[in-house]
Amino acid sequence: SVAVAGAVIKGAALTFNILQ
């Protein structure tokens, strides 16, 4: 669903920011 996709994208972005 759109909500799940949004959550996955947000999670990936958050993880990316933490790893930077």
Swiss-Prot record:
Oligomeric and partner information: Octamer or nonamer in membranes. Monomer in the soluble state.
GO BP annotation list: killing of cells of another organism; monoatomic ion transport
Record function comment: Pore-forming toxin (PFT) that consists of a crown-shaped octamer or nonamer that forms cation-selective hydrophilic pores of about 1.5 nm (inside) and 13 nm (outside) and causes cytolysis. It causes cardiac stimulation. Also causes hemolysis (HC(50)=0.4 nM). Interestingly, the Phe-16 is crucial for hemolysis.
Extra remark beyond the main annotation: This protein has been found to bind carbohydrates, since it shows a substantial delay in elution profile in size-exclusion chromatography. The carbohydrate pocket ovelaps with the lipid-binding module of actinoporins.
Record bears the keyword Secreted: yes
Protein family per UniProt: Belongs to the actinoporin family. Sea anemone subfamily.
Site residues by UniProt (Part of the hydrophobic cavity (in subunit A) that receives Val-60 from the adjacent subunit (B)): F16
Swiss-Prot/TrEMBL domain comment: Composed of a long N-terminal alpha-helix and a core region rich in beta-sheet structures. Before the pore formation, the alpha-helix binds the lipid membrane, partitions into the lipid-water interface and stabilizes the monomeric molecule on the membrane. Finally, it traverses the bilayer, thus forming the transmembrane pore.
Top-rank taxon: Eukaryota
Compartments, record wording: Secreted; Nematocyst; Target cell membrane
One function term, GO molecular function aspect: lipid binding
Protein name in the entry: DELTA-actitoxin-Afr1d
GO cellular component term of the entry, any: extracellular region
Thermal properties of activity per the entry: Stable up to about 47 degrees Celsius.
Organism: Actinia fragacea (Strawberry anemone)
Keywords: Cytolysis, Ion transport, Lipid-binding, Membrane, Nematocyst, Secreted, Target cell membrane, Target membrane, Toxin, Transmembrane, Transport
